[in-house]
Amino acid sequence: MNFKGVKLLKNSKKRLDFLPNTLNKYSIRKFTVGTASILVGATLFLGVSNEAEAAEKIDSPTKEKVATTEEAATKEEAATTEEPATKEEAATTEEPATKEEAAIAEEPATKEEAATTEEPATKEEAAIAEEPATKEEAATTEEPATKEEAATTEEPATKEEAAIAEEPATKEEAATTEEPATKEEAAIAEEPATKEEAVTSEEAATKEKAAIAEEPATKEEAAIAEEPETKEEAATTEEPATKEEAAIAEEAATKEKAVTSEEAATKEKAAIAEEAATKEKAAIAEEPETKEEAATTEEPETKEEAAIAEEPATKEKAVTSEEAHGINNKNKQLLDMDKNSTIDEKFDYAKQAINELNINQKDISNIEASIKNNSDLKNLSKEELNNEILRAALVNESNNNDYGLQTLSAIEPLTTNVRNKNNSLSPVSRLKMLATATSGQNVNDKINITNASLTLNQKNNQHDDNTVWPTSNEQLRLSADYELDNSIKEGDTFTIKYGDYIRPGALELPAKNTQLRSKEGSIVANGVYDENTTTTTYTFTNYVDQYQNITGSFNLLATPKRETVTTDKQTYPMNVTIANQEVSENFVVDYGNHEDHLTNAAVVNVDNVNNQHNEVVYLNQSGDRIYDAKYFSIVQNGTFIPNEVKVYEVLDDNVLVDSFNPDLNGPAVKDVTSEFTPQYSLNNTRVDIDLNRSNMNKGSRYIITQAVKPSGTGNVNTTYELTRYGNEASRYPTGTKSTTVSYINGSSTAQGDNPTYNLGDYVWLDKNKDGIQNDDEKGISGVYVILKDSNNKELQRATTDDTGRYQFNNLQNGTYNVEFVIPNNYTPSPSNTIDNDTIDSDGQKDGDSNVVVAKGTINNADNMTVDTGFYETPKYSLGDYVWKDTNKDGVQDSDEKGIQGVTVTLKDKNGNVLKTTTTDENGSYRFDNLDSGDYIVHFEKPEGLTQTTTNSDSDENKDADGEEVHVTITDHDDFSIDNGYFDEDSDADADSDADADSDADADADADSDADADADADSDADSDADADADSDADADADADADSDSDADADADADADSDADADADSDADADADADSDADADADSDADSDADADADSDADADADADADSDADADSDADADADADADSDADADADADSDADADSDSDADADADADSDADADADADSDADADADSDADADADSDADADADSDADSDADADADSDADADADADADSDADADADSDADADADADADSDADSDADSDADSDADADADSDADADADADADSDADADSDADADSDADADADADADSDADADSDADADSDADADSDADADADADSDADADADADSDADADADSDSDADADADADSDADADADADSDADADSDADADSDADADADADSDADADSDADADADADSDADADADSDADADADADSDADADSDADADADADADSDADADADADSDADADADADADADSDADADADSDADADADSDADSDADADADSDADADADADSDADADSDADADSDADADSDADADADADSDADADSDADADSDADADADADSDADADSDADADADSDADADADSDADADSDADADADADADSDADADSDADSDADADADSDSDADADADADSDADADADADSDADADSDADADADSDSDADADADADSDADADSDADADADADSDADADADSDADADADSDADADADSDADSDADADADSDADADADADSDADADSDADADADADSDADADSDADADADADSDADADSDADADSDADADSDADADSDADADSDADADADADSDADADSDADADADADSDADADADSDADADADSDADADADSDADADADSDADADADSDADKYHNDTADKSNDNELPDTGNNTQNNGTLFGSLFAALGGLFLVGSRRKNKNNEEK
């Protein structure tokens, strides 16, 4: 790869977030031997957090503990002598610090830092000066500390914070007299102890603890002595500093006082002046670094700030005035600025901040120049400017600008600086750790990619620019230029990600490890390729820490990815993303695979790791018959690798992909190598394979794979031949091919299997400068190490870790150069001083470069001896004295005093200013941290004084040296540079002294008091503005959250829930049906059929009783369902609506108006419907006839059923309710419903039939009126259809029908539309809403919409979805829950109130909902309902509520019914469900319990209601509600249970099947739909009944149990009601009785009738089916079968197919329907179909439904099926159950029905079919479809393959690289020879024959 020089781009705005790092595994950025001032600067500007502690323990030669004479240091806690502090708070001497803030006692030490007052620090800790007492307080020694606690003078610190008395030390920390150091730094006083430890007479420091003079720091924070300041502000002794600035004490002692020869630093430790650093911690006296900020003693700061003492002690010891003179540093306050300050203001701020770093003038100039040249200075904020100052300081510190390479032309050179600090190792290590993050970050966004392109690397003139021939050695070239942001650091990463059709590399496999280099060869980043993600991740080396503004470019090879690019002459998009820049080009790829050639071959890849070429050969790709075949291959410049040649027989031609990358691990090939053992030549340059015994003579194809190992430097050429005979001289060639591998840029250099080793060792601090590692000499971290080969090419880079170690890996034998970059302020140790490579220093200085170089040799072993040592370059001081020479003799006399305030400037030998200072009160000055060299000291003459005589005495220490003195320092300090001045003589001036009075003006100086303005700092208080934060109270807006009350709107859902209840109601009714679903009961019918009696719920619907009810409850039921009471209860449920309606009721009442209509209808319809169902049956017949109507009904019913199916959907809704639950119900209902439907049909059956029959019988008679009503319904239904639209009004009627839901009743069957109506009711409610919709839809849809409803149901489904919503509203449920509680009651009510619940809910929700309702529509609905508004609301509801209903919320309530879930348990009841759900169910349970009571109440109520209103039914409904809930729940769970039901469902399914089938069949019937309606009837009758019965049985099982139990349970209370419930509920027992009669009749009749109806329906169906048939069309049926859905099961897949087929067939039906699809349209078609009419529609709907069902409704119906689906859902489960198909079989029967429907219809065999088909169709079809599809596909694929291959052609064939054309002559010669041979043989045979003759 070519890499150009790089340019490093630094983002000056990026904050350098320095984090501590103590892990050896991370490379540490080296900031050279940084000074403590830089460390302080980092704190001042950045506020480094002290997150981590030093990783290693501090070694100290001292004993573990040294007791002091008067004070003992404690281990971790400080005990107080007077008062304990509270937990986690530190007590201050005057004011307490806040929680978790450190109270600083004026001079505290923090944990893990040791400080002594007059005591030495340990080996690795800094000692505190002798006299640490602050200005405010004097150190005392009078209060001893306890064993584990140190006493404080006034208040103790608590467990977590050690507030230490005057002089306690905490564990492992060094404290300064002025301020605490942070967690990882030791505080250094200005006069630390001498060598290793000096134990004073008063105090001794322990190994890891140093006692602090007066006040300790706490564990993590320092206790504040007098007055804590606010967070993040630093206070000075007199004036507070601004945020993030450290206040400096007024009088800081000098950094390093004059050190006498007796006071030299010891061998082991260099005592450091202002900033003594220990190995791991440095406590800084003057400019301490605290966790965030530094503060002074008088006004110490609170959390994260440290207090600074005013007068810190000196470094090594207290120096007397004769020994050294201190420095008077004026207390300066840093200027402040913000982002809007001017450039000059910002620069002034920066200058002052830089001066505070206390570094030499040259460094200051460099940093100031960097800041001044920052083009973005104008836009920098204070924090950003602080970061930039620190960045510039660190860059200036780095001084690593040369690694033995020339400075890149694209890189800004970095200047070398002379440090003016005595830099120790520890601050460097700490600063390095602080400045380096623990791990790199992805910096894709910090790399600017330009000029990125993807082109052909090597173009063949035989094709255009966007075509690539990979097998002809063509590659793609990826090129780009890049620019790196300066904030990128070592360890950061960026990526190059390759797309799906491209990979890196050429013919070679991608290298695992790659490198990005500069143009000089330095490694900029190391890359690792991941073939799983096709991504190369590059990690930057320390190269980016060394240079700025790095720019460069690269060129990488890439090639098409053969695994995905498999077809010749196809265009593929080649995408590569470099960092964040994407490059994309389209290329046509051609591998040159000639399918008509007998031999095709290619080199697939070159594996450099294993040093081999992998080749693939296709033999006889065209499939010719080849006899006596032999294969051989010859290689030049290489050898075949034995055992790597493999032979595969091709079993599937698709494996022969054009890319020569076949899948050899799959079933498409067979490894037959063992049958044809390859034979190798002696030198392995030829391999032969005898294929004579292969199947090639039968046209088989073979694949040969072989591996070649290159043996030379030339191109590797391989030929491949397939011959008839192996003899080359006389061979009859049938195919030849050759390949050639040539190399580009030497990219194929093999690595082979050579072993690799490691090289490395250690860089250490050679304290004794002898070049030999001693045991006590530690490693130096952060040193850059560069590995180069013998040709000086850079190979790897590393940085020494915290222990000084480095290592390079994966190296082969050879000699290497190891370069160590010399750290600043260090000098290389002598090299090779002894003959022991393991401990001596190996590095030798390399000329003028800043590196030492060591040789390292690897010879079959690791070499871990290449090490080098450095010692600290010594620093020196210069200074002396400026005095007033009163006698003017130029010599210092003892009575002559110093002059304060004289400016002294230090310059280098060229006159450049390095430092400036002023003399202190004694006239002393001093410059520290100077290297050996030449300097100039300049004294600025004070105004009014005259220079004295210079060099007047031989004593250099006493005479004056003059105003400018040249000084040379050579390995020593110079404290002899002084000067003197005397007062100017001017008596005249003396007179002017009178003017001295004018000095009174000097008082003007008092104006200097203007400094009082410093008080302006009190403006800091303006921070009080922080109170503005009180605006945070704006959060009060959070109150807006109160809007969350809007969620109360969710209550709307609650209303929805109310509606949900409505659904419940519907379901309630539906459930009533549900109870009908109890139909599950109907199944119960089956069970009870007694449940039939429970269908007495059916009875409920046994509206027969319902007529009974109808009579009493008729309305009760009707009402019960309908409204009257049903609504009353219905309202109860209605109340479900009642609630929704409850308000709804009001509305409900309004609805009751609507419902009233409903009632009117209900009664009418109730009976009507009940009759309707009865009629349904009668209508069924009517429907059959009416099927037109039925279809109309079919629509209505159809939908109803459709809904029924729809209902199934409705069940779906019921399921809707059910679905969420409904489906659940669907299962529960659906099953139940299914039964519901089935039952719905069942109802139809159970009710319809049973009831219908029952009704038919019971009501039939009574319903006979009902029938008349039935007619009414049938008309109603008819109307429903007719009205469907009219029922659109029927809405009200629909409601009516909803009430027709009476259908509810009838359609109680209808699932009282338990379905539709469940939806209907759901819609009732839903319709109420649904009606709203269903009204709306109900309208048209009511019927036609019935399909619409079906859609309504779909809406119902919507409700189903609603249910989904309902569940969603389950949130509503939340309200529901609120209601839940209320539901609890509600449920209690649920039953009674179900609606009551609804109300509760409504109310609860109502209230919540009330908002909701209020919002709601609920009320609105109510109103809406109140009026046609109901419809309006319907809309409203339909909107809100519909969904609200949709919300199924009902379900949601039902779900709310989470209780439902409880119901679920109820569901268990659900199974009981059925009745259980029935209801005790849920609510019984949910409310269960309350409901249980509720249910009991429900029953009770329901009974109460039940009794009172058939509400029993209503309650039943309420139970229904319970069911609804229960079902909803039960549904939900019902499903579960439903599944139980599903079991029931399975019965349900049976029903489901009934449904499913009923639907399916129903669908078939559903197709009958009419039957669906009829179906209701149909189902009810035909299959339904049969199924119903079957189901019934199924139900019988589930329900009977379920109900029995359910009721048993709920009714257990209910059971009285149980069945009585069912009945009780249903009948309110009263009915129950009537029902029981009804039951008796119901079943009796129901079955009888059912049968008769079945026939009737069958006829109905037959009619319906007639239509149905055509539509059912047998297809339908077949689909039915498909639906039969054994497919249903198949359905499940079959459905999938069967659905598809179902659809498809359904489409057949569908087709019949296509409408099925139409059904989606079918629904609309349903209408259309309703035109179909009922028939077609019935079917179509039915089919539509069934299809619809199959499809959408299929889903819907499927719901029916859904129920099936429901079952499908449950169904699927149910179906599964359905498939539990036992029912499925029933279904099969159902299918039979389905078919029978289709046929049944066709045959009107509803009956005949019902059963007979049952079997026949069911399965056979199912299977038939399944198989046919299977084959179909197989073939279709086959065709597809043929089509694909047939079109292949090569317009431009690739040249066979390396092909040998001279063989052509041989070919022709051989051909003619062969022909001649044939003639010769023939001639001889002829002659022989002649001879024999």
UniProtKB/Swiss-Prot annotation:
Residues 72-323 are annotated as: 21 X 12 AA tandem repeat of [AP]-[AE]-T-K-E-[EK]-A-[AV]-[IT]-[AST]-E-E. PROSITE patterns: GRAM_POS_ANCHORING. Residues 286-302, 981-1836 have a biased composition (Acidic residues). The keyword Signal applies. Residues 54-222, 240-284, 312-325, 955-975, 1837-1851 have a biased composition (Basic and acidic residues). The modification Pentaglycyl murein peptidoglycan amidated threonine is found at T1857. Belongs to the serine-aspartate repeat-containing protein (SDr) family. This is Serine-aspartate repeat-containing protein I. The lineage of its organism: Bacteria, Bacillati, Bacillota, Bacilli, Bacillales. The gene is sdrI.
